[in-house]
Swiss-Prot record:
Protein source organism: Mus musculus (Mouse)
Similarity remark: Belongs to the phage and mitochondrial RNA polymerase family.
Transit peptide start and end: 1-41
EC number: 2.7.7.6
Gene Ontology biological process terms, A to Z: transcription initiation at mitochondrial promoter
Extent of the PPR repeats: 232-266, 267-302
Active site per database record: D893, K962, D1121
Keywords: DNA-directed RNA polymerase, Mitochondrion, Nucleotidyltransferase, Repeat, Transcription, Transferase, Transit peptide
Subunit field text: Homodimer. Component of the mitochondrial transcription initiation complex, composed at least of TFB2M, TFAM and POLRMT. In this complex TFAM recruits POLRMT to the promoter whereas TFB2M induces structural changes in POLRMT to enable promoter opening and trapping of the DNA non-template strand. Upon metabolic stress, forms a complex composed of FOXO3, SIRT3 and mitochondrial RNA polymerase POLRMT; the complex is recruited to mtDNA in a SIRT3-dependent manner. Also forms a complex composed of FOXO3, SIRT3, TFAM and POLRMT.
Summary of the function given for this chain in its UniProt record: DNA-dependent RNA polymerase catalyzes the transcription of mitochondrial DNA into RNA using the four ribonucleoside triphosphates as substrates. Component of the mitochondrial transcription initiation complex, composed at least of TFB2M, TFAM and POLRMT that is required for basal transcription of mitochondrial DNA. In this complex, TFAM recruits POLRMT to a specific promoter whereas TFB2M induces structural changes in POLRMT to enable promoter opening and trapping of the DNA non-template strand. Has DNA primase activity.
Pfam families: RNA_pol (PF00940), RPOL_N (PF14700)
Keyword Transit peptide: yes
Protein name: DNA-directed RNA polymerase, mitochondrial
Positions of the UniProt region annotated as Mediates interaction with TEFM: 773-1207
């Protein structure tokens, strides 16, 4: 990765624009002089070396300028910045900078003096205005200021004055109440942040065995009246659990008494901790009986200890010993049978009647067992090292010296980091024992070597342009948390139990075992309880505080010799990382940026490895089946069932409140998607690597290397250049820099994907899945999966192949023509005939992809087209094509799937026909139909003399309107649609560009008008959904609903809230738009509801299709509304797909939605706390929900016979 870094920066170009200065004499060689001398004796020309020096100085000056702005910034007193040592610029320019700073200082002092004088003069007037607002009427003003104007003389004036004063009093009262509410919310937010920090502190103390420290901090805050409000029942229970595990009964009782003293009532967890402690220390029977009696008086029966709590095995055993000692006849209740999902839509899936053909994996039991242990080793290691596919550099003397220098530096840094970490822990430990909840226990969660390893990894991947401190801190905090959670599972013997359970689970999946057919989740649950107690995730402020502390250690400890950066000057160390400020949009952002010399060192060394976190890489064995919110996917690494922005808690809360059986459908669908085994298409990968290592090819989606980035014509201007020329050069340099950074980003993404593909070549792997808040599914590994680009999809094949059968080859050919995009309006029979016509081109593409006629390169999806050409070539050349084993996934796409759902909801006959819900001989193309109708509107307007309509003659095409038609169903506005059309028009070289703005305005109106006529029910449903969401959010609630498969959904769009993490390098301000304590963001709530609701329907349709395909023995995966399976199984998948769409829309979806919204937002319990204005909104909401959109006469059963519904 380091070889891709781009070290030029537009912010420090001043040095580049100056005339070249004299050459400096070389410095004496120091400890690392070998590398410096090799740089001096490189093959680069003097001109190139001079340019590099100029760029280096520009980078250093950028750092200096940022530090000056940072330290001298006005209006940002919260930004406290520690002194960071920087390498000074050349001496020849120091006086100029000193003069500039001195001048700025004088100007600032003068301005500050003027401001102070103005403030002093206006103070009295300010308070007068604040207390008594001026009314610009002399007569009325007199009544408001009686001390200046006297008192009113007649009764009419007195009444008027009293009325005005009363009105102002009410206004002031309302303002005061609003201010009080705002302050109360701010205090609540601060207390919540503190509570999250304290709870994480206590849990870390218990995990690291430092219960006395937790006890000490708890007592310190309990005895302080102001601080006691921060303590919660969960915190007291956590400390009690720590003492229980140590068997320290006296200390536990002390905490129990503190809990009572704080006015809290003990819960089931409190009594469980006490009884565990008694079970561990063999407490006398009377004490245990008294505890049980008190517990039952509080309403908790002993059976609940074993049914309502998820306990570690050792804790459960100690608890049982204590209860049995007091009540010898007690027996824990047996495990309750798994509840059964009773959803109408899922009745066939969970029915025990009828034949089932659940597919098994193609691998035997021994192989799967071996793969499990390989994956377990990977997850215990927490990271994966992968060989980079970047072209290896020539091992010149310069490269060898750079690698030696880098290795020597890293050895020094590890020692220094270890020292600084120990010093920090000692300091924080002393503060913690003074009663402060510091980060000390967090720094004890992992070994010191693990912390150093995490920090050293940061230095390898930090980009040359730097990384925002908030982002770096968050990533560091998450890494520590994830490694801690894995380590906890090792400590509690969870790993050994998992190995035993997984061996039994593989009996269901292996190809050489015989087990009664069963869903993976059902089989896993039948093996007995394994689930460990859910780990409480740390809050974002806690993650940031820990990550920021680690980042500060890195800045403080990691230094390098100055000789690596400059040829002259004192032989001393300089920082490798600099903390600077930059502007991102309108916000000032703190950034950790590597020194340019360090970046150059990394680039020169060009190390051949990349390192990924475990969860960033596909799994080497089948994922764990999803059985709950906390159990599924990776073996040890924690994975969220519902992915969301960090800090979002409302989704988790709703899911936890769900009856377990309600989520069985989504859980089983995610498990089925994750159980699909994959392999890499090795032949295609070789071709891609050949192009990647050459110079890339953007038309084929292979990004070129940095060396292909555009360069400015010149780097410097001759002396005496005008300001205009300087400005032009600056713009040119900035443009080149922008393009180069974009290329770097794309190149890095391709590098990760191809390196992982090469790493997994000749291996079978799996992609565990989870879902977003709408129910849409996604693979967990981010860099290499089937949801990526054309190139990413082409590199993947099913690991299990299946014979083509009698019609499989035909479907391969049809799939090939679909990928080219050449015959979209033709029937399947015509596409098949066309494939036979171009068979020579297909075979030439397969045999000579880079040297032949390259027909495949003209396709819409070139790499997938090439992969299909190769598969077709192998099949037609095999002795028996029907017996050919095919691994290629064949796709079936929905026809504008969002509009299909809208048309089905509204039973819209015209709309249904446009999106292939009705049978037809040829596929209907809604985009072409809209373009045709818009052209008719244009012709009519042109006849009437409208200039823009006349200019657009010959330019209205399917491509111009497609994106707007596609996204209008997902809530695109006229403004957004205009921008989309404008972009398409600018791509037309022969379109008069002066008419682009006017033409895009005209076309977006016509597109919306066309859709209004074609999809009448669609617009009515969209309006109904939008209006409902508008009323709900104005009344103060976020919009909620439940999908047909039972997933509870809540839109996490709220007004922004801010939390500050102070101290250290800088204060970090965390801005969140998902804080449910804030009011809903009305605009996002109402605009988001229609598209999110439709997304929840398309995810329900996909999950139903996946489960029924699994029941029939098919391998099925999806990319949202694009369904994949083997060529031979396409007819079966299409049949299932249509059936489940009809079954889904046969449900009263809108009626059920209206009932849910009424119950949730219009019930007496919901509105009793609302204001009168908000109750009026609820009344209007009830009226809106009662008036459902009218539906048409479309017969939904026609979908069953529609060949092109998905095609």
């Amino acid at each position: 990765m380091s070889a891709l870094r781009w070290t030029r920066s537009a912010a420090g170009l001043g040095r580049v624009l100056r005339s070249p200065g004299p050459h400096r004499p070389p410095s004496e060689e120091g400890t690392f002089g070998g590398f410096c001398s090799s740089r001096r004796s490189s093959a680069a020309s003097p001109r190139e070396q001079h340019v590099l020096r100029e760029w280096g100085h520009a980078e250093l000056l950028e750092v200096l300028e940022a530090r000056v702005r940072q330290l001298r910034a006005e209006g940002t007193p919260e930004m406290r910045v520690k002194k960071v040592q920087v390498d000074r610029p050349p001496q020849g320019h120091s006086s100029r900078w000193a003069q500039k700073l001195e001048a700025e200082k004088r100007v600032k002092q003068r301005r500050q003096k003027e401001v102070d004088q103005q403030k002093q003069a206006l103070t009295q007037e300010f308070w007068t205005l604040h207390k008594e607002p001026k009314i610009w009427n002399k007569k009325l003003a007199g009544y408001l200021q009686p001390s200046k104007k006297g008192t009113p003389t007649n009764s009419e004036e007195k009444q008027l004055a009293q009325a005005l004063q009363a009105a102002l009093g009410r206004l002031s009262s309302r303002e005061a109440e609003a201010l009080a509410r705002k302050k109360a919310k701010a205090v609540e937010a601060q207390i919540l942040v503190l509570q999250q920090k304290f709870l994480a502190f206590f849990e870390c103390c218990v995990c690291t065995g430092q219960v006395p420290l937790a006890h000490h901090v708890l007592v310190t805050h309990h005895n302080n009246g102001d601080r006691q409000q921060v303590l919660t029942l969960h915190m007291y229970n956590t400390v009690m659990l720590g003492w229980a595990r140590k068997g320290s009964f006296r200390e536990l009782v002390y905490v129990f008494l503190m809990l009572k003293d704080a006015g809290l009532s003990p819960d089931l967890c409190s009594y469980a901790a006490a009884l565990q402690c008694m079970g561990r220390r063999d407490q006398d029977v009377r004490t245990i009986q008294r505890c049980l009696k008190q517990m039952m008086e509080e309403g908790f029966q002993p059976q609940l200890l074993f049914t309502d709590l998820v306990l570690e095995e050792e804790d459960r055993a100690a608890l049982l010993r204590a209860v049995v000692k007091a009540e010898p006849a007690f027996r824990p209740p047996p495990q309750a049978p798994s509840p059964v999902n009773t959803s109408t839509l899922l009745k066939d899936i969970y029915s025990k009647e009828g034949p089932v053909s659940y597919p098994k994996l193609h691998l035997p039991l021994d192989t799967l067992q071996d793969l499990f242990y390989q994956q377990l080793h990977v997850e215990l290691s927490s990271s994966v090292c992968v060989q980079s596919v970047e072209k290896a550099p020539v091992m010149s003397k310069e490269v060898i010296e750079a690698r030696k220098t880098l290795q020597a530096l890293r050895e020094q840094w590890e020692v220094e980091l270890l020292r600084v970490l120990r010093e920090t822990k000692a300091t924080m430990g002393r503060q913690a024992y003074e009663g402060q909840p510091t980060l000390y226990p967090f720094l004890c969660l992992l070994s010191e070597g693990e912390f150093v390893s995490i920090l050293m990894q940061v230095l390898k991947v930090l980009p040359a342009q730097g990384e925002p401190l908030i982002q770096l801190a968050h990533n560091l905090g998450l890494r520590v948390l994830n490694r801690h959670l894995v380590k906890q599972k090792q400590v509690t013997n969870h790993v050994q139990k998992l190995g035993q359970r997984y061996s039994q689970y593989l009996q269901l999946l292996a190809s050489d075992t015989q087990v009664a057919p069963c869903l993976p989740r059902e089989y896993w649950e039948s093996l007995g309880p394994l689930e460990a107690p859910a780990q409480q995730p740390w809050s974002v402020p806690v993650l940031l505080q820990l990550g920021k502390q680690l980042a500060e250690l890195l800045v403080q400890a990691v230094q390098m010799p100055r000789s690596l950066a400059a040829r002259q000057g004192a032989q001393r160390s300089i920082p490798v990382l600099y903390h600077v400020y930059s502007f991102r949009s309108y916000r000032q952002v703190g950034i950790l940026k590597p020194h340019p010399a360090f970046t150059h060192l990394l680039e020169t060394a060009a190390e051949p490895t990349l390192t990924f976190e475990t969860t960033e890489v596909p799994m080497l064995c089948p994922p764990l089946p999803w059985t709950s919110l906390h159990s599924g996917a990776y073996l040890l690494s924690s994975t969220k069932l519902m992915r969301a922005t960090e800090g979002t808690t409302q989704h988790q809360r709703l899911l936890e409140q769900c009856p377990p059986a309600q989520l069985h459908g989504p859980l089983d669908a995610l498990t089925q998607l994750g159980n699909c085994a994959w392999r890499v298409n090795g032949h295609l990968l070789d071709l891609v690597l050949q192009i990647f290592r050459d110079k890339g090819c953007m038309p084929l989606g292979v990004p070129p290397p940095r060396s292909e980035a555009p360069r400015p014509a010149r780097y410097q201007l001759p002396p005496g250049s005008t300001p205009v020329h300087k400005s032009e050069l600056r713009k040119e340099l900035a443009r080149c820099l922008k393009v180069a950074r974009e290329m770097h980003s794309l190149r890095s993404e391709a590098l990760y994907r191809l390196s992982l593909a090469q790493h997994l070549r000749h291996r079978v792997f799996w992609l565990p899945h989870n879902m977003d808040f709408r129910g849409r599914t996604y693979p967990c590994p981010p860099h290499f999966n089937h949801l990526g680009s054309d190139l990413a999809r082409a590199l993947l094949e099913f690991a299990e192949g299946r014979p083509l059968g009698p019609r499989g080859l035909d479907w391969l050919k049809i799939h090939l023509i679909n990928l080219t995009g050449l015959k979209k309006g033709d029937s399947l029979r015509m596409r098949l005939a066309f494939a036979d016509e171009v068979m020579e081109e297909i075979l030439d593409s397969a045999d000579n992809p880079l040297t032949g006629r390259k027909w495949w390169m003209e396709a819409d999806e070139p790499w997938q087209t090439l992969a299909c050409c190769m598969e077709v070539a192998h099949a037609v050349r095999s002795p028996d094509p029907a017996a050919y084993i095919s691994h290629l996934p064949v796709h079936q796409d929905g026809s504008c799937n969002g509009l299909q759902h809208y048309a089905a909801l509204g039973r819209d006959s015209v709309g249904a026909a446009s999106v292939n819900l009705t049978p037809s001989d040829l596929p209907q193309d809604v985009y072409r139909e809209v373009a045709t109708q818009v052209e008719e509107f244009r012709q009519q307007d042109a006849k009437e003399g409208l200039r823009v309509a006349q200019v657009l003659e010959g330019f209205i095409s399917r491509k111009v309107v497609k994106q707007t038609v596609m996204t209008v169903v997902y809530g695109v506005t006229r403004y957004g649609g205009r921008l989309q059309i404008e972009k398409r028009l600018r791509e037309l070289s022969d379109f008069p560009q002066e008419f682009v703005w006017e033409a895009s305005h005209y076309l977006v109106r016509q597109v919306f008008k066309s859709l209004q006529e074609m999809f009448t029910s669609t617009r009515a449903i969209q309006h109904w959904l939008t209006e409902s969401a508008n009323l709900i959010s104005h009344a103060g609630w976020p919009v909620e609903w439940v999908t047909p498969l039972g997933i509870p959904i809540i839109q996490p769009y709220h007004r922004e809230s801010k939390v500050q993490v102070k101290g250290g390098l800088q204060s970090i301000t965390l801005t969140s738009s998902v804080d449910e304590s804030q009011k809903p963001n009305t605009l996002k709530q109402k605009n988001g509801f229609p598209p999110n609701f439709i997304h929840s329907l398309d995810s329900s349709h996909m999950m139903l299709t996946a489960l029924h395909c699994y029941r029939k023995g098919l391998i099925f995966v999806s990319v949202h509304d694009c369904f994949w399976t083997h060529a031979a199984d396409i007819p079966t998948m299409n049949e299932v797909c249509r059936e489940q769409f009809v079954r889904l829309h046969s449900q009263p979806i809108l009626e059920d939605l209206a009932k849910f919204l009424k119950k949730r937002f219009c019930s007496v319990s919901s509105i009793k706390s609302l204001k009168s204005s908000e109750r009026a909104l609820v009344t209007k909401l009830q009226e809106t929900l009662q008036s459902l959109p009218k539906t048409g006469t479309f017969d939904l059963g026609q979908v069953i016979r529609s060949t092109y519904f998905f095609s």
